[in-house]
């Protein structure tokens, strides 16, 4: 099992797709890291040698990207700042509503949560 930046990568996936389990790395940047580490794109996570894992770990730790914990902290602080200055986006985050102008009369279920049923009024 390969462990990078505190994340256990899935065992039987191709290494490019396994790297996307690290917060902040998408498929494109994963492919660039693999190319820099001189690892074949068809290599599975189980087939990575310890030397290749060390090279990959060094590349990820020394890159200029914010990854994993730093990125989560950065995003959390940005949302906290929006809440503190009481702007529209901060209010939307606080109320668990869509932030980027999407409609809420219908849809937005994943952001707002499951429907809350209201009992009908008896006559």
UniProtKB/Swiss-Prot annotation:
Keywords: Chloroplast, Plastid, Ribonucleoprotein, Ribosomal protein, RNA-binding, rRNA-binding. The keyword Cell division does not apply. The keyword Chloroplast applies. It is found in: Plastid, Chloroplast. Residues 90-123 are annotated as: Disordered. One of its GO terms (molecular function) is rRNA binding. It holds the Pfam family Ribosomal_S13. GO terms for cellular component: chloroplast; mitochondrion; small ribosomal subunit. Residues 102-123 have a biased composition (Basic residues). Gene3D superfamilies: 1.10.8.50, 30s ribosomal protein s13, domain 2. One of its GO terms (biological process) is translation. Its main location: plastid. Belongs to the universal ribosomal protein uS13 family. Part of the 30S ribosomal subunit. Located at the top of the head of the 30S subunit, it contacts several helices of the 16S rRNA. This is Small ribosomal subunit protein uS13c. It comes from Thalassiosira pseudonana. The gene is rps13.
């Amino acid at each position: 099992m390969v462990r990078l930046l505190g994340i256990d990568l899935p065992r039987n996936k191709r290494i490019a797709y396994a790297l996307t389990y690290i917060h902040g790395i998408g498929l494109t940047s994963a492919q660039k890291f693999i190319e820099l580490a001189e690892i074949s794109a068809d290599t599975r996570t189980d087939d990575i040698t310890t030397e290749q894992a060390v090279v990959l770990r060094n590349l990820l730790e020394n890159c200029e990207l914010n990854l994993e914990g730093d990125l989560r902290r950065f995003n959390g602080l940005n949302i906290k700042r929006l809440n503190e200055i009481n702007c529209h986006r901060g209010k939307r985050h606080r109320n668990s509503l869509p932030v980027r102008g999407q409609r809420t009369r219908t849809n937005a279920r994943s952001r707002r949560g499951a429907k809350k049923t209201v009992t009908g009024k008896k006559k």
